[in-house]
């Protein structure tokens, strides 16, 4: 009996050990499965992270390329802006110089016109000869006032082609050889001009009468030549 009981006790102990071993193995398998699942999730997460990183790197490369292109475009625009600013400054300076030159020419022209008008007025007063300026330079129309010693006034009208040298010479000679007071004043003005060495004011180009061989040694320096191209507001 005692041996039987001892044998039963050994079997029971052996059973408990086997049961414990199986239980431990089951727990280990369960842990391995859990660890495997976790490892699989971690591996998937790592793969997803790598793919996300690769996508971000591609996007970053694209953005970097776009940024580089925009920086280059900004540099080109900045360079163009500087060039345009320099060109604008040069244009402004040129316009300022042209305005100053135009103002100077306008002032000189106005001064010259005033001088010619004053000269014309003086010659008109001295010679008693008045010209219709609206007809110039095509025609030389006007009237010469001759005052005799007894006070009588005689009006001598004239109408000549602006390019008729013979007609202009004849008019000059008739005015120059007059004996009235106006003619003497005129000759005094001419002699004063010759003494002062002043050059006659003459029109340019085709407006100036050309001397012919008949009068090659005598070219009139008169109000006719002075005012062929100069406007005036004096009454004709």
Swiss-Prot record:
Question: Is-annotated flag, keyword Magnesium?
Answer: no
- A GO CC term attached to the entry: nucleus
Q: What is its main location?
A: nucleus
Q: Which residues form a coiled coil?
A: 44-106
Instruction: Please give the residue ranges the record annotates as the region Disordered.
Output: 194-217
Q: The organism sits in which domain of life? A: Eukaryota
Keywords assigned: Cell cycle, Cell division, Centromere, Chromosome, Coiled coil, Kinetochore, Meiosis, Mitosis, Nucleus
Q: Carries keyword Cell division?
A: yes
Compartment(s) of residence: Nucleus; Chromosome, Centromere, Kinetochore
Q: Name one GO biological process term.
A: meiotic metaphase chromosome alignment
Report the function annotation for this chain.
Acts as a component of the essential kinetochore-associated Ndc80 complex, which is required for chromosome segregation and spindle checkpoint activity during meiosis and mitosis. Required for kinetochore integrity and the organization of stable microtubule binding sites in the outer plate of the kinetochore. Participates in SAC signaling that responds specifically to disruptions in spindle microtubule dynamics. The NDC80 complex synergistically enhances the affinity of the SKA1 complex for microtubules and may allow the NDC80 complex to track depolymerizing microtubules.
Subunit notes for this chain? Component of the Ndc80 complex, which is composed of Ndc80, Nuf2 and Spc25.
Q: What family is this?
A: Belongs to the SPC25 family.
The protein's name: Kinetochore protein Spc25
């Amino acid at each position: 009996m005692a041996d039987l009981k001892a044998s039963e006790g050994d079997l029971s102990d052996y059973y408990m050990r086997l049961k414990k071993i199986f239980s431990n193995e089951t727990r280990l398998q369960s842990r391995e499965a859990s660890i495997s699942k976790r490892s699989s999730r971690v591996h998937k997460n790592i793969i997803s992270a790598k793919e996300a990183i690769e996508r971000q790197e591609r996007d970053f490369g694209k953005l970097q390329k776009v940024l580089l292109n925009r920086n280059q475009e900004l540099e080109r625009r900045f360079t163009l802006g500087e060039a345009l600013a320099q060109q604008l400054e040069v244009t402004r300076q040129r316009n300022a110089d042209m305005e100053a030159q135009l103002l100077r020419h306008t002032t000189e022209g106005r001064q010259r016109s005033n001088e010619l008008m004053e000269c014309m007025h003086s010659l008109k007063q001295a010679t008693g000869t008045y010209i219709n300026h609206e007809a110039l330079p095509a025609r030389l129309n006007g009237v010469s006032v001759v005052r005799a010693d007894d006070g009588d006034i005689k009006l001598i009208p004239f109408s000549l082609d602006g390019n008729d040298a013979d007609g202009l010479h004849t008019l000059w000679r008739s005015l120059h050889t007059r004996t009235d007071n106006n003619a003497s004043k005129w000759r005094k003005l001419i002699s004063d001009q010759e003494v002062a060495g002043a050059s006659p004011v003459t029109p340019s180009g085709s407006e100036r009468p050309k001397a012919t061989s008949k009068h090659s040694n005598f070219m009139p320096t008169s109000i006719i030549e002075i005012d062929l191209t100069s406007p005036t507001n004096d009454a004709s």
